[in-house]
Amino acid sequence: MQCALYDAGRCRSCQWITQLIPEQLSAKTADLKNLLADFPVEEWCAPVSGPEQGFRNKAKMVVSGSVEKPLLGMLHRDGTPEDLCDCPLYPASFAPVFAALKPFIACAGLTPYNVARKRGELKYILLTESQSDGGMMLRFVLRSETKLAQLRKALPWLQEQLPQLKVITVNIQPVHMAIMEGETEIYLTEQQALAERFNDVPLWIRPQSFFQTNPAVASQLYATVRDWVRQLPVKHMWDLFCGVGGFGLHCATPDMQLTGIEIAPEAIACAKQSAAELGLTRLQFQALDSTQFATAQGEVQELVLVNPPRRGIGKPLCDYLSTMAPRFIIYSSCNAQTMAKDIRELPGFRIERVQLFDMFPHTAHYEVLTLLVKQ
């Protein structure tokens, strides 16, 4: 992938950009095999990759510069701002949005937040696009509600310029720290969730719910899990750390009893909305801590699917799964190091199948799917 920002030494986020995709996949596969070297693996499936550019459905832009000439991008470690509107990871559809946002910021008087001086209001612009209909969600992350009235007043112009903006919100993040969002979300549109669709499964994206940033690869990940589950003799499963329900909704059949657990209420609201659309009445989604939910149960389902954050599922949940011994565990991980550490804590299981998904091209990161079977 060619990138003018990288070539000019202005951005180094894509550290592997000079390597061809097959070389990147080989290096990632070697890393994964090294991490799982102590475990016999019955089947290594071919790695899955997607487009090498224009694949991201989300932009997280630090707003810097001046109110008259805002920059959207990032801050270097020394505080120097860098505009990333031309980043080739973003689809072409993002360019007109960035172009309209700059004069809008000036018109609405949204002074960019200055980290060094601890002054200003607009901290971040967060943009998400649906692959199914091109609709977009735009979030303004502000330090306070001081400029909210001005933003509301100027908003009709932006909506006229960009009719693809279906959901617009203001998030209030008052803390002087590099935290992307605060707890308060103020909706400026009637619509509160962005409709998405993977493999004919309706999904919803809300402001404070996690959603994969590489839809081309994520849709293949979900489809693969569905295929793996359909091959297993199970009618009951848990989907832990379920997010907006992507895995569970793909796996569910009318006679499958499924419980999805996720700590974020916004994500659970999305999952419930999708289940209702599909008419699946045996799916139950709850906003709870996954580890606390599981370890409080006196019995375990035949299949437990886990998709934890980078820290992994942790020893308490590993100990519970070791003791209760479900027939199958499907582990989806964005950090193979912690996954390998967790598998070490599950001695009663063997690794039936492993597949790498290149969710983050041009970096060392990847997603991995592992099927564990009770010995």
Swiss-Prot record:
Name of the top EC class for this enzyme: transferase
Taxonomy, superkingdom: Bacteria
Recorded catalytic activity of this chain's protein: uridine(747) in 23S rRNA + S-adenosyl-L-methionine = 5-methyluridine(747) in 23S rRNA + S-adenosyl-L-homocysteine + H(+)
Keyword NADP listed: no
UniProt binding sites for S-adenosyl-L-methionine: 212, 241, 262, 307
SUPFAM superfamilies: S-adenosyl-L-methionine-dependent methyltransferases (SSF53335)
GO BP, one annotated term: rRNA base methylation
Record GO terms (molecular function): 4 iron, 4 sulfur cluster binding; iron ion binding; rRNA (uridine-C5-)-methyltransferase activity
Role played: Catalyzes the formation of 5-methyl-uridine at position 747 (m5U747) in 23S rRNA.
Annotated family: Belongs to the class I-like SAM-binding methyltransferase superfamily. RNA M5U methyltransferase family. RlmC subfamily.
Full protein name: 23S rRNA (uracil(747)-C(5))-methyltransferase RlmC
Record gene name: rlmC
